[in-house]
Amino acid sequence: MIKFIVFTLFTLNLFAVDLITLYRNEGINSVQKEIENQLKEKKYWEEYLKDKNVDLGYYESKKFVLLAQKEQAEIALYKKDENDYKFVLKNNMIHGENKGDKFTEGDKKTPNGVYELTQKKTDVDSFYGPFALVTSYPNIFDQSLDKKGSGIWIHGMPYNAARENFTKGCLALNNPELENLEKNLDFNKSILLIAENEFKKATKEEIILILTSVYKWKDAWKNSNIDEYLSFYSNDFKRADKTGFSLFSEQKKSIFAKNEQKTIKFSNMDISPYPNSFGKTMFKISMDEDYQSPTVKFVGKKELFVEIINNQVKILSED
């Protein structure tokens, strides 16, 4: 914690004497509270991100970004360094036979969205080439929309045989290109963005708005401020189990009424622009959450799917 505070002190460009005085008079908890307040401020993130490229998103844990653009029939790999993305390679690909976003099983469409690579599957039929990289479709947002289907892979081509110039929904590359792609990434630290047409890059202003909003949302959650907390949710909010905003808000009001003391820590935050077929400016936020209260203890992944509308961040789905 001390290392975190010292690092943030210099990053924030605050007067060290002010924080030292605060520490001397009120203790380390007051210093931490002041720093947490700064995380809700636009000024901090403007300074922190000023030299960083966020075109493909903001990543604290992911090291590789795969960008698939269906209309262009191309998939590109980028490697993240400290402040930028290094272009690694680009390959032609084939995708679902039918255009558009995937909604139903068997529609022969490739989904638009953001997905993890969950597994390298080697026990595949020779029709799929040497192996397949399994994606996380359907994700939480897909499930909230009742999207159907599964088994969306990045795979190869049949050995010594021809095939159609399209798939049932997967992304497919020539086998040497698939093998070269896999050699150049760590699928456990990769994110896949699938866009229908040309990918819409994120802006620094969007990422800053999301980061400040996440920390304001966390603060409202921590302090059981139900009105402010719920203000971050869209009226169209829906969980994967189809729980809508009305029932969700009633559940949260009951929990917040207990006014329990709690600590909430976020780390390894990743923010990805979310290509979609709804005309929304969407992002997927993934982070590690450490939640501790007298009645609930949770350490694990937290995912938010949000849209920016009228310069506000609204949560559409959550896990």
Label every model-predicted segment.
Residues 273-319:
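Exposed beta-sheet edge and beta->alpha loop/turn motif
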Residues 17-58:
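Extracellular/luminal recognition modules and glycoprotein regions
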Residues 206-225, 232:
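Short, aromatic-enriched amphipathic alpha-helices that serve as compact interaction elements
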Residues 230-273:
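Short solvent-exposed beta->alpha transition segments
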Residues 4-12:
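Sec-dependent N-terminal signal peptides
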Residues 42-151, 161:
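Gly/Pro-biased beta-strand-loop elements
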Residues 92-98, 154-158, 289-292, 316-319:
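Short, solvent-exposed aromatic-acidic interface loops
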Residues 107-112, 119-215:
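Exported/periplasmic cell-wall-interacting domains
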